[in-house]
UniProtKB/Swiss-Prot annotation:
NCBIfam families: L12
Protein name per the record: Large ribosomal subunit protein bL12
Name of the coding gene: rplL
Keywords: Ribonucleoprotein, Ribosomal protein
Example of a GO biological process term: translation
Superkingdom in the source lineage: Bacteria
Species this protein is from: Anoxybacillus flavithermus (strain DSM 21510 / WK1)
Length: 121
């Protein structure tokens, strides 16, 4: 029996006969005709869950205009003048920890505008 003859025989079968054929093939060869489950959806959800939600803003270098940077650090953190100066003078130091990505980007932009070098981790 050729492949074409098998296809013709299957074309002429009723739905009930096809169902019986599938069951017989599953039993004979130890396979299943069930559609494979797509695992990629679960993997994507896992990757999204692992995405970082809290970021630390690290002042890497106070830059040449430290007075401007100290003012911005005070504005962002509420630190006193001495504490802000110590933070800027002793880099690298975290300015803010555990903030959202948006807030971290805003803080980075303000500090870089004042002349500092900033990292987000």
């Amino acid at each position: 029996m050729t492949k074409e003859q098998i296809i013709e025989a299957v074309k002429n079968m009723t739905v009930l006969e096809l169902n019986d054929l599938v069951k017989a093939i599953e039993e004979e060869f130890g396979v299943t005709a069930a559609a494979p489950v797509v695992v990629a959806g679960g993997a994507a959800a896992g990757a999204a869950a692992e995405e970082k939600t809290e970021f630390d803003v690290i002042l890497a270098d106070g830059g040449a205009q430290k007075i401007k940077v100290i003012k911005v650090v005070r504005e962002l953190t509420g630190l006193g003048l001495k504490e802000a100066k110590d933070l800027v003078d002793n880099t690298p130091k975290p300015v803010k920890e555990g903030v959202s990505k948006e807030e971290a980007e805003e803080i980075k932009a303000k500090l870089e505008e004042a002349g500092a070098k900033v990292e987000i981790k």
